[in-house]
Each structure stands twice: as C-alpha cells, then as structure tokens.
Amino acid sequence: LEISLKLDRIDSVNGNLVVIDYKSGEVTASHWDGVRPKDPQLPLYVLASEPQANGCAFAQVKAGKIKFTGVSASDLIPEVKPLETWTAQVAQWEHAIGALAEEFTSGIAQVEVFDSGSFQFQNYLLPLNRWHEESDINTELLDKSTQ
C-alpha cells in the first residue's frame, strides 16, 4: 500500500527525531493503542520517518490549553513521560497498522464505531457505508457459496 504523508513538524532533540502534529481540539495518545488504533496518524509518521523517530506528540494549541500529549523513548518532549518500552510500542504500531493496511488492500473496509456519540453522524453516510446491509450481503454470499 503506497500513501503520501505530510507531517506538521519534525524536531531534532539531542540527536533524536520527534514527530509533532498540531491540533486545536482535544487529543489523547490512548487513541494510538490496540489492534485497531482509533487515530493511527502519529504512529504511522513514526514508522515512516527515516531515520526512525524516537518520539511523537500532539501539540495542542487550544486557547487556554496549550500542551504536548505523546510518547517517546527518553525525556525528549516537555510534559511527556518517556516509555521504557519504546521499541515494543513501535513494533506494536507496526503490527497494527500493517494489519489495517492489509485489510484495506484486501477490500475490507468495515465501519468501525468507537463511541456511540460519533454514531449520530452516520446518518449522512448511510448510502456509502452500507453497514445496515451487512447481514443481507453475508446471507447472499453464503447462499452462493453453497450452490
């Protein structure tokens, strides 16, 4: 899978690269966790950087709430506690993002609803995502495979 990326900023801190992405809204690094990350943007930037970055963070630039939220291999980013398991974290991101890319290139593009609050916006996308037709499609495919 070939994609183009546009990073906001890469800093060199004591010879280590740190990927920074500016955000004006609420941000959380926990959205990078798990087998299906909710927001894989910064982990993808880390994996794509050459040489590989040793940290990544959102730089929240919201009035009255300016802060860094992220992770790093060592004490590279103000207000961000370093991870003792940076190498393992990068390996987990590589596995998770690789699995997502493999699904996408295989034609798997299911709708993933992470929280019920975001589901209210799905009404506008119903003609595109077809999640409500999933049961009928699976039944039809099963019928065709048994014939």
Regions found by a protein language model. Give the residues of each.
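RecB-family 4Fe-4S metal-dependent nuclease core
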Residues: 1-147
